[in-house]
């Protein structure tokens, strides 16, 4: 609890004790009434002040105004105990709401407790000095001792250790790191001493981007939140005017009919109507539900950029995957080399050198298989041809390395290969030199992930890939993916997603899942863009609506289940709050419901709705 909450709790306790004493002990009226007024002012003075300021600033219609009018009116009718009770229970509800929101924020802060407080930097004498991470420049060597957080992204230059990435990924399995491995901020060093050369400033590091993402998520409102905001703006003035009509019209009608006006009875009913009508339960619990849902998701390594995306994900019926790095490991290995008119080693050397400037996983596998240091001085005029391959001049000869489309582009006859895998054809000075077969492994949970998506209510799964049809069909068959589209260029993937979007129902959403490396256009075109394996990937965090911090495809169904649970809670609160209020408003208007029922309809409903909203935090076992 903060100071404000503690102070309010003391006021509530004092007011409650005094209220109970006054109700239990039979006191003369001339003592009882002043005591009730003292308790009323002690617990409600701030509400009265807020209502007065609202009137002065011409922002009349809010819950403070409703409570002030209702309780002052009750005092005017000499219902001192009910006026005090309404104000007391309203303040109890407000305190509980404040505490619940604060508690959920604290939980989320603890779950996302990844911000490092300091970085260790060696001074000129070799002594460690703790400095603010913001002060550390790129290229600085920082020292991370066991038990400390990695402060800034970088590369290990000395030492080996295991890192706990649970706060980022939701997974407890530690990650082994040693010299030349990349590490990201927010991880906890568990065993050995590490010296890390920073590759980013703190403001651009992974931990900063994640914290910004989580903190700014509340600024992107869902349709449900926007509806509640609009509803409250119309609803509050409407019930105020309805209460005024309830107070004036029946007595006037009675007078016209020659009956007693009975203004006191109708004023009491109008005041009861006002207390019941307070929209706190909706205004508070709906944003809290989304806030808790986003916080619970972040604990599981699912970062949602706004409640609008969480709401959209709950209506997701189609999931489209990129193959490489999403359903497969993206760790390619050379499975075979078929040479034509040059030695096998020379074919691999030419292919590796031509691809040496590319960051594509296939290029990395060729470099790994080649195993030697690349002499970049031998390579000239490198040109990457999107969706086809690479053209380069190596040792004065022109080398083409890529798929069959590249061979067709340059009218080079090539040998068909029926091996399962990605085929890299190589041509030297316009003559076919052979091809290299590269295979990719499925991710361990890929098949389970597709099954889990079907159980989560996904109608259709689709896989898009630039790979050849034989490889794509084999992967889709193994994983039981419904549809597969192969041999696609990057622009073809965007067109295919647009085609799929045009075929779906307007109330159904389509999610695209990619590894965030080359998928930015498709991620932004889908209803929901999901980047997975984003640990350390700036591009993924920027491009996607939802970011999965590790490589486990099972997290996709987890994210959908979290979204559905959150939206289910939101609608529970909407139906419950509106339903109870409508019934009580009707009972209040006809005189059956009194102030005590009104207190339940306001404070009781709010507390129940807030408690229900907090359930959205609990997503671990989904």
Briefly describe each language-model feature range.
Residues 1-31, 38, 101, 110, ...:
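Flexible metal-binding regulatory segments at protein termini and peripheral loops
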Residues 12-16, 227-257, 272-290, 571-600:
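Bilayer-spanning, highly hydrophobic alpha-helical transmembrane segments
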Residues 19-122, 135-142, 149, 160, ...:
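Actuator/coupling domain of P-type ATPases
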Residues 52-60, 99-109, 288-307, 614-622:
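Juxtamembrane helix-loop transition segments at the membrane interface in multi-pass membrane proteins
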Residues 68, 168, 268, 278-354, ...:
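Conserved catalytic phosphorylation-site environment of P-type ATPases
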Residues 242, 504-507, 544, 549-622:
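Membrane-embedded transport module
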Residues 334, 338-460, 469, 481-497:
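P-type ATPase nucleotide-binding
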Residues 396, 422, 428-572, 580:
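Conserved ATP-binding TGD loop and adjacent catalytic N/P-domain core of P-type ATPases
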């Amino acid at each position: 609890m903060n100071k404000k909450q503690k102070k309010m709790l003391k006021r509530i306790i004092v007011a409650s004790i005094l209220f109970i004493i006054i109700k239990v002990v039979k006191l003369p009226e001339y003592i009882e009434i002043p005591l009730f007024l003292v308790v009323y002012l002690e617990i409600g003075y701030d509400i009265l002040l807020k209502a007065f300021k609202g009137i002065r600033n011409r922002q009349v219609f809010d819950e403070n105004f409703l409570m002030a009018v209702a309780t002052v009116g009750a005092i005017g009718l000499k219902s001192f105990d009910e006026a005090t009770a309404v104000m007391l229970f309203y303040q109890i509800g407000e305190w509980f709401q404040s505490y619940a929101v604060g508690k959920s924020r604290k939980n989320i802060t603890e779950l996302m407790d990844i911000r490092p407080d300091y970085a260790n930097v060696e001074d000129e004498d070799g002594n460690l000095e703790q400095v603010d991470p913001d002060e550390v420049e790129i290229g600085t060597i920082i020292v991370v001792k066991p038990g400390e957080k990695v402060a800034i992204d970088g590369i290990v230059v000395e030492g080996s250790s295991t890192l706990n990435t649970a706060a980022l990924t939701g997974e407890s399995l530690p990650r082994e790191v040693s010299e030349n491995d990349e590490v990201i901020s927010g991880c906890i060093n568990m065993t050995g001493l590490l010296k890390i050369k920073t590759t980013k400033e703190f403001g651009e590091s992974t931990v900063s981007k994640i914290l910004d993402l989580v903190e700014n998520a509340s600024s992107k409102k869902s349709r449900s939140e926007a509806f509640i905001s609009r509803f409250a703006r119309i609803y509050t003035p409407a019930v105020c005017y309805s209460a005024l009509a309830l107070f004036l019209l029946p007595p006037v009608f009675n007078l016209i009919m020659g009956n007693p006006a009975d203004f006191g009875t109708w004023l009491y009913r109008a005041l009861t109507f006002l207390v019941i009508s307070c929209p706190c339960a909706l205004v508070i619990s709906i944003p809290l539900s989304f806030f808790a849902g986003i916080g619970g998701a972040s604990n599981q390594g699912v970062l949602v950029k706004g409640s609008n995306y969480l709401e959209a994900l709950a209506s997701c019926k189609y999931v489209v995957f990129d193959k490489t790095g999403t359903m497969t490991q993206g760790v390619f290995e050379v499975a075979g080399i078929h040479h034509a008119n040059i030695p096998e080693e020379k074919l691999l050397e030419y292919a590796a050198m031509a691809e040496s400037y590319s960051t594509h996983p296939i290029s990395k596998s060729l470099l790994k298989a080649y195993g030697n240091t690349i002499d970049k001085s031998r390579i000239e005029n490198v040109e990457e041809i999107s969706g086809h391959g690479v053209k380069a001049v190596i040792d004065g000869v022109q080398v083409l390395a890529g798929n069959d489309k590249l061979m067709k582009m340059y009218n080079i006859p090539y040998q068909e290969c029926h091996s399962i895998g990605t085929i890299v054809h190589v041509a030297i000075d316009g003559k076919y030199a052979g091809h290299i077969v590269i295979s990719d492994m499925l991710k361990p949970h890929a098949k389970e992930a597709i099954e889990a998506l079907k159980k989560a209510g996904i109608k259709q799964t689709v896989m898009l890939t630039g790979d050849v049809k034989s490889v794509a069909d084999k992967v889709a068959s193994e994983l039981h993916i419904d549809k597969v589209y192969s041999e696609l260029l990057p622009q073809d993937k965007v067109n295919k997603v647009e085609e799929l979007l045009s075929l779906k129902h307007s109330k159904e959403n389509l999610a695209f899942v990619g590894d965030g490396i080359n998928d930015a256009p498709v991620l932004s075109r889908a209803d929901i863009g999901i980047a997975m394996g984003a640990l350390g990937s700036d591009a993924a965090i920027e491009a996607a609506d939802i970011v999965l911090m590790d490589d486990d495809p099972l997290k996709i169904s987890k994210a959908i289940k979290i979204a559905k649970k959150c939206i289910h809670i939101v609608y529970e609160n909407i139906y419950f709050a509106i339903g109870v209020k409508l019934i009580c408003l009707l009972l209040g208007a006809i005189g059956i419901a009194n102030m005590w029922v009104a207190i339940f309809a306001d404070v009781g409903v709010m507390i129940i709705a807030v408690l229900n909203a907090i359930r959205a935090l609990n997503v671990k076992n989904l």
